[in-house]
Amino acid sequence: MEAASRLTRRQSLLLPLILTVSVVSALELSSRLMTYVLEEFGEAAHQRLENWQRLHALAANAPTDRQLRLVNSFFNRVTFVSDIRHWGQEDYWATPVELLTTNGGDCEDFSIAKYLTLRAMGVPDDQLRIIYVKALELNQAHMVLAWYETPGSDPLILDNLINDIKPASQRNDLEPVYSFNGEGLWLNRTSGDNA
């Protein structure tokens, strides 16, 4: 667990840079990639990627609350699979294309995919944070995406464990540890605060 924790911390320090670079091309999938996915992974995987692109096209100009609901619902249809079972590794952070192509991923994969999709739709980076939390009922590490209407507001939590988007103040099952986005990394100020 100590090694996995160190790896996660290391990844989280690099992620803001990766997220900033990745958001630009998050939904621009080449015809070559789409052909490869169709040939190697089949029609269902190809269709999931097309649906992702369609979601972006349809929701890019929608109000933010609708974008949040559509993106959360879209990715929550993907099957939860642990990294060990899915990738044969203790901790693997999949790209949205990998998540959708294989139709499986864990909480980090869901959070990253939601973040990148919302950024590609124009949601400002300063309104989004990926939050590393402790899921108290499961007694394990977990990751969610938060949307802040304003910097000091109670964020809305997009989570693959539940389909409803709720304010952090109503998520007593989550204890935040740290959060990050393309701009930086923040440590939780006081233990016991909700995401």
Which ranges hold each PLM region?
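A structural boundary/capping signal
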Residues: 2-4, 23-195
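N-terminal secretory signal peptides and thylakoid transit peptides that target proteins
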Residues: 2-18
